[in-house]
Every structure is written in structure tokens, then in C-alpha cells.
Amino acid sequence: GRYRDALGVALPTGLAAAHVEGGADPLGDLLRRHARTHVPFPAAEPARRWGLGVVAVDAGLRRLARTDGLLHGSFLATGGASEWCHPEVLRSLRRRSLAALRRQVEPVPVETMSGFLPAWQGVDGGRRGLEQLLEVVGGLQGAVIPASTLERDVLGSRVRDYQPRLLDELISLGEVVWVGRGPLGSGDGRVALYRRDDAPRLVPEPADLLDGPLHTRLREELARRGASFFHDLHRACGGGDPEELTDALWDMVWAGEVTNDSAAPLRLLGPRPRRTTGRRPLMRLAPPRAQGRWSLVAGLREPAASPTERLHALSATLLGRHGVLTREAVLAEGVPGGFAGLYPVLRAMEEAGRVRRGYFVDGLGASQFALPGAVDRLRAVRDEPPGAVLLSATDPASAHGATVPWPQLAGRAARAAGAYVVLEGGRLRLFLERGGRGLLTAGEPGPEALAALATVADRVGKLEIVTVDGEPVRGSALEAGLRQAGFGPSPRGMVLWGGAGRRLPVGA
């Protein structure tokens, strides 16, 4: 009835009486309904919709302003005519706008970092080839990584179809160098990669110089001779047991004093055979872990950089790796002087407009510095969590045990070489203990997480899981999912073979 009385339209016959009743102010009723169901609008909008004059509609809206409190003003950033808006609509819009603004400025939960870092660092990305491997090394400069996981788990997860020859080529071209950062037992150690051009500003001084007789002699010979093969060093140091000299070289490697022009010695680390007593064999070949040319790391720090240059280079490197740099991240990196030492440089970068300072991640301290674009990426991960990702527990992109605390698990998790984490939806779902025998769960891992876990077999050759959360894997809640992911029964649990040796589960 209101359409008939206000607009003069003919109604179809047969309508119920309730639908044809008019009102005292039919145009006002139509405008009131329009205002309640629309965002701010100019008078021309309902006039155009109903084929009425703007003057008549404007008069009706002004009557509603007096009777219903309809609001008139500039509500939209269009620069056009002023608009009309129902007060309830405006209150609703303000509530939604405030909620959106709060979500834009509120810190993300700390767990979001676990999904953000792999995406930020390009894990499982599309990088390929020599030049993009060099980019990856640039992002990893100074990160301390176990030698046993460096290529298999860290470089291999960032560069598709990674081959060791790629790193060898970059080293032989003088583009990349590696430096030892401490032993891990008798068959492994921590190393850091650097771009050769950045080494003078990033390679740290060794904490202490080793003072054993062989260490001192090696240091003198390398300083005098420059880069040298093992046989030349062995002869210059007076001969003797080649294994003793090799051990002394590696002592100096892990102390950050000596490096090599190849990554091959790193690949040949592992448990050493027991020495036998008796006559020493004649040395015809250098011990495998002594191949390549050895040189002093001190040469990489030339030309010498000033302390300020070193701090600026380190700050830029850490920001590039983490995107959002926090006190906890700096602590996990083992930076001398900690966050306080970098703070003046970070403040200067903020004042220059190169970084933003704010409280971006909940629970990680009030002073956080972020690169442009990193905060938007961080919030995008919060709003749309990524799929399943497999990481070495020691990967710089693995936040757990560094910036993010471990969730409650049925066993002890640690950033140990040979252990793996599986993230799903940006949250930790699986922790595979070193050696692969024990699996710990957080929440309910889905098929995508178990499929990611199965790829460990391709890296290590064979993955045999014996327990889940301390209980036998056979008969556990994960048994069916593991079978679906390709695992089959073994005498001790469930097994999956990697690569060409992969076996389908029984009954598949």
C-alpha cells in the first residue's frame, strides 16, 4: 500500500488486505525502511530508485530527521554530496570500524610467529638455481646451523631440486664462505654461512684462541702460507699422526679460526673410527675430513669494518631474517651484547623510516622492530594460516624453542639436530624426536600434517616410528593416518622408505 500511495504504482489484484493498507506518511515509511537497511546515502539514491524528484525525497528525509533522528552530514570519504544515515546504522558501522581497526593494531598471538617465519624465509618456495641459492644464503648469514642439517634440511627446503654442487660452486666462485661456530658432539658441529662481500662486517671474532702446540703451529703456518692443502700443513708442522693434525684443524674450525674452500669436509663429518695402537701407517691420502684448502678466518674480516658498520650490518641481517625482530629472537641468535646492543641502531633505522617500531607480537616485549610489509604478512598469516610445513627443529625458520615456547607435549622437545617439527595451520602439530623413533603430538594432526611428516623419509632414507606420545604406534590413534600417509608395519612399529625404496603399506 505504501508503494501505491507514495509512488502512485498500481498493485496487482488478489493481494491480502495486510499488504495493501496505506499509512499516514507512506513516503516517510519507505524512506525510513531504506535508511534502516542502507549505509549512508544521498537523497538522489532513493529518488533514482523510485523515480521521484530529489526535492520531494529530500523533504521527506528532513521530516524524518525531526521525527526519527535521521542524521545528515558527510559520512563517506567520497567528496560528493552529503548523506543521510539512520542512527542505528551509523552505530553499527562505527562498531565494525573500531573492531577492524583494533584488529589491525592489536598484536598477533605469539604462536603466529611459527607460521610466519617459514613463509617469510621462503621455505617450500619456488626458488631454484645458483643465483637464488645465493639469495637464500644472504638471508641465512650468521645463523648457527648444525652441519648435518645445513644442506639436507635448511638449504634443501628453500631451493627446489637443491644439489650439493650448487653450494660448492658458490664457494669455489668466492661468493660464499662458511665458518664454524662450535662442536656438537664428536661427529657434528655448528656452522654459519656468509656472502663473501658481507663477511668483513658479519663474521665474528673468535672468543678465545686455542693455545695447544699444534694449534699454535697451524696458526703460524696458515698465517705465513695462506690457504694450504693438508699435506703441505702436515709437512710444515713436522709430520706426525695425520689424525692428530686433523683433530687440531677441526678444533680451530669450531673455534671460528679456520675455514675451508669447500663444503666437502662438512659432509664427511660423523663418528670417527676408533684408533688402533701399533705402528702408524704411511700417509698417502689426507683424511677425508681434511680435504680441500684450509685458511684463517681472519682473512675474511678484511678490510676491517668499524664497530658501527658491524652493528648496522648485523641489525639489517637479523631484520631480513626475522621480519619482526624481538628481544627473544636476538637472544636465540646468540648476539653478543644482546638486544640492548642493537637497540640504538634499530632506533636510528626507525627514525630514518626504514623500520617500524611497535607491539606486533603478543608476549615478546614492548620494543619490536619490523620491516615494511612484515607486519601485514604477519597479520595475513594470523587471518589465513598456511598449510602443513615440515622443518628441521634447528631451522632458523622454526620458532619453537626460540621465540615461541613449546606447547604441552607428552615428552621433551628440543631444538636438536635430527629432530623435526610439522606445522599445520601455523601451529605445531608434530615433533619427531632425533632418530625418528618417537613422535609427539600437539592437538590433532590432520592428513596434511602426516603427509608432511612422511617426507622425512625422503631426506633420511628410512623413517621408522616406534612410539607416539610414549605409547606404541601400533594401535595408536595415529596408526590409520600414518598408513594413509604411506607407512607400513614393521617389527617395532611403522616404517616408510624414502625415494625409490618407498614401500606401500600392507593392504594398500
Regions found by a protein language model. Give the residues of each.
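Long, charged, low-complexity, helical-prone intrinsically disordered regions
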Residues: 1-508
